[in-house]
């Protein structure tokens, strides 16, 4: 994966664990044979020389962002790795031949996971205004999404993940994998 490779030539080593994009991988735990003294990491288990550290800064599986930058595929990685990109507050969304630019959202709301399986994920959302939902699970074209039984578009988000606009109010969002 080009995303992992770009982090540090394919290797995630203790000296780059504070990379803000590492937190975008939703990596809550890190195994290491060495101690990690990076802020935000706490040793939670050790057996022999193997240590397990908890990453307090790992982003959740689902979250809303305040800003979306719409780019073409060629600019996605460049935008993600720019010094100004903050994965906690914004997302980079790949668009094909559509209007590129920025869009602001509220970035606040409730997300409850109802069901999480290999080919079906169900969440309940509740937000006062339209929001952009980032789902830190691999983007793949065969995934479909339904908001209150109405099919919506899943966008490639932050290069490797999924995202979609969620309307204001309470909604049932169902992601399902289709081989057709």
What are these regions (language model features)?
Residues 1-106, 122, 128, 150:
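Extracytoplasmic
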